[in-house]
C-alpha cells in the first residue's frame, strides 16, 4: 500500500482510512498521517476512526492510562497537523457528523462520530466540521476491494500472513 497510495486517487486514501483493520495496519496508518500528500479527508477520517472522541475525555497525557498514551500522542499530533493545514486539500470530503461509511452495518450509513462519544464536543471545531467535497463511503469502493485495498494488494497481504503462520 505504501507503493500504491502515493499514485492512487484521493478516494483510495479515504477508502483505506475508513475500511482498514487498524489493529493489523497500524504502521501503514501511521505512515499515512505523516505524509503531507495525505488528503485532508483521509486524515480526518483516521482521526475519528482512531478514537478521537474517546480520548477527548483526557485533558492531559498524564490522565491517560499508560497503555494508551502512545495512541493519545498520535491523535494529538494528527489533530495539530490537521488544524495547521499540513494535509493536502482535495475534492474528496469527509463529514464526521455524517460518515457515509456504515461502520460494518450496511443498513445504517451516516454515523455521527461527534454525537457518538460524550466527550467529543470538547474537541476543536475544525475537527468536528465537515470537509467540503464528494463524500466517498466504503459503499463506493470498487468491487473486489477488501479492507480498503485493491484485490491484488490484499492477496499479497493475505499471503504474507499465511507465510508467517
What are these model-derived regions, one by one?
Residues 1-165:
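Alpha-helical scaffold segments
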Amino acid at each position: 500500500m505504501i507503493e500504491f497510495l502515493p499514485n492512487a486517487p484521493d478516494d483510495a486514501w479515504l477508502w483505506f482510512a475508513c475500511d482498514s483493520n487498524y489493529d493489523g495496519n497500524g504502521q501503514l496508518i501511521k505512515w499515512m498521517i505523516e505524509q503531507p500528500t495525505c488528503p485532508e479527508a483521509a486524515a480526518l477520517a483516521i482521526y475519528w476512526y482512531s478514537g478521537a472522541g474517546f480520548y477527548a475525555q483526557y485533558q492531559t497525557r498524564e490522565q491517560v492510562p499508560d497503555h494508551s498514551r502512545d495512541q493519545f500522542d498520535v491523535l494529538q499530533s494528527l489533530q495539530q497537523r490537521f488544524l495547521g493545514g499540513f494535509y493536502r486539500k482535495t475534492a474528496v470530503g469527509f463529514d464526521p457528523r455524517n460518515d457515509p461509511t456504515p461502520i460494518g452495518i450496511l443498513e445504517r450509513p451516516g454515523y455521527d462520530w461527534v454525537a457518538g462519544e460524550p466527550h467529543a464536543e470538547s474537541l476543536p471545531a475544525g475537527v468536528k466540521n465537515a470537509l467540503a467535497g464528494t463524500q466517498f463511503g466504503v459503499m463506493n469502493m470498487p468491487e473486489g476491494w477488501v479492507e480498503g485495498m485493491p484485490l491484488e494488494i490484499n492477496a499479497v497481504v493475505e499471503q504474507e500472513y499465511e507465510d508467517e503462520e
